[in-house]
């Protein structure tokens, strides 16, 4: 009996794997099935609003393993299961990725070819409020070609976070937020 092509296997398994991951309270970010010698490697990438810890990875692994065992006819043989969370270099491609990146520094390539480094504020289903070059602005997802979180080794400036919070609350910016107070002149 021949086994179905790799992409077809993942497509057939995705609904049941997504259901198992969702039932555990997580989001399925990616499902990949590759041939690895005589076995298949099933890679499941999961995430959640609060991140994913090792205990949760174990829980999800058990749930997905049960589902895969029940659908072993799709895999057509033995498999190795790898459950992981996304790496820091994962592109932000969905609104939930942007929500999880709140207050993080992100490198953005816009559809017009320009690049920005922004601090992420509130995100909804259409776009995200960011602090870019000292200015609060809104980026529509349709205008973003690629976005990746930048690794930071220090806490973000408190004034940046305050400005993003005020923008989320709809409060107007005040001059003191940009450092143009009497004391800073």
UniProtKB/Swiss-Prot annotation:
Major location (coarse): cytoplasm
GO cellular component: a single term: cytosol
Region (Disordered): 162-185
Paired cysteines (S-S): none
GO biological process: ribosomal small subunit assembly; translation
Lineage top rank: taxon: Bacteria
InterPro entries linked to this entry: Ribosome_maturation_RimP, RimP_C, RimP_N, RimP_N_sf
Subcellular location: Cytoplasm
Annotated signal sequence range: none
Keywords for the protein's UniProt record, in alphabetical order: Cytoplasm, Ribosome biogenesis
Family as reported in the entry's similarity comment: Belongs to the RimP family.
HAMAP family to which the protein is assigned, alphabetical: RimP (MF_01077)
Function: Required for maturation of 30S ribosomal subunits.
Name by which UniProt lists this protein: Ribosome maturation factor RimP
Native source species: Saccharopolyspora erythraea (strain ATCC 11635 / DSM 40517 / JCM 4748 / NBRC 13426 / NCIMB 8594 / NRRL 2338)
């Amino acid at each position: 009996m021949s086994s179905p092509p790799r992409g077809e296997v993942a497509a057939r398994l995705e609904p049941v794997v997504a259901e198992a991951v969702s039932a555990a309270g997580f989001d399925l970010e990616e499902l990949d099935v590759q041939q690895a010698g005589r076995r298949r490697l099933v890679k499941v990438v999961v995430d959640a609003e609060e991140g994913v810890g090792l205990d949760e990875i174990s829980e999800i692994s058990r749930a997905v393993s049960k589902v895969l065992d029940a659908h072993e006819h799709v895999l057509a043989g033995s498999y190795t299961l790898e459950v992981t969370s996304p790496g820091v270099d994962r592109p932000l491609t969905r609104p939930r990725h942007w929500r999880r990146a709140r207050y993080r520094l992100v490198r953005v390539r816009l559809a017009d070819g320009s690049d920005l480094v922004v601090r992420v504020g509130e995100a909804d289903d259409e776009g995200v409020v960011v602090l870019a070059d000292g200015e609060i602005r809104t980026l529509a997802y349709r205008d973003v070609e690629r976005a990746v979180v930048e690794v930071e080794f220090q806490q973000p400036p408190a004034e940046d976070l305050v400005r993003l919070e005020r923008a989320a609350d709809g409060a107007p910016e005040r001059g003191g937020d940009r450092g143009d107070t009497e004391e800073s002149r």
